[in-house]
């Protein structure tokens, strides 16, 4: 990777793109330290610390700590991520949007424009909920209409600026800008997580105990990274053969190809969906100061990921079971709406393609579905293992880390994709980076 970057710096165009990307990253990190006017940051920091691991910790990891700092970038890129997921689902549910998506570059530009508007609306709603919900409890130095409006405008504008920076990185930098911003936010929390693990397992312990703890932590991290790489790059290739056709005096066609089915087709979406649904009631109750009691209080505690692996309260582990089931369900659900075996089989039939040993048309569709279901299950199980490890660490050892399975999947996939993009641009210019190794 380092050799690739060094070779990329030898090319003026790529060097400028990389430097532009770094400059935009610096702007985002600086903006993450600028406080929102009229906000009591100490109150929010102490409140957040009392929450422990959970929905807000997950949210803070995606904002790079901007949320706990209550900076102008507190909402960061999260409204855009939510907006993108909503639009992706809507293109399946609404035929007009689906046609727009298939309408080439012009259609994609229209969808991107709609996504921006939805992002601003979501940011506005989230900012208003924060200002009004927490404002009464002490978030605002003075709880009045003016301060509420200032906070709402500042947070909404901050989210819009981060979205704009992400798009500029995509246009003038390297990689997907939104993904780069998200990865930088997650990585910015890494030193804090390492310090927390050091305090929990190594500091004050005997040298031998500290060394063993460090080795175990390192081994777990390496195992997680290996599993994530397998999930990210694992592919089942279905061979496809194309029949030969006679055109004039020549035979054309007859080539071999394949249909790549990724092990983890849905990416981190199942984890995000499952976590969001389970933690949403907790977030709403926190915003409006609702303290659940009795039966409903127990339900809320069961939804909180910080209680799932609590040995002193094993009844809350039912929340972990529900989480695992939801991750597997959403892995199947999301893949079913983004991957259409029937459409693929019909296109193959029109082009004279077939899977060896399988009849074209409906039998091909059934075969793809059968293979896909097995692959999704394997990917969903791997995704679940990566996703629940942080909860186990938190419950059994009290180690609260934001650098969990979801973060790791995002980081690995974005880094690998960015490297591939740099490599492809270098190959165009007869550079081969580490591909020569």
Regions found by a protein language model. Give the residues of each.
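N-terminal cationic and glycine-rich segments that engage phosphates or anionic surfaces
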Residues: 1-101, 105-437
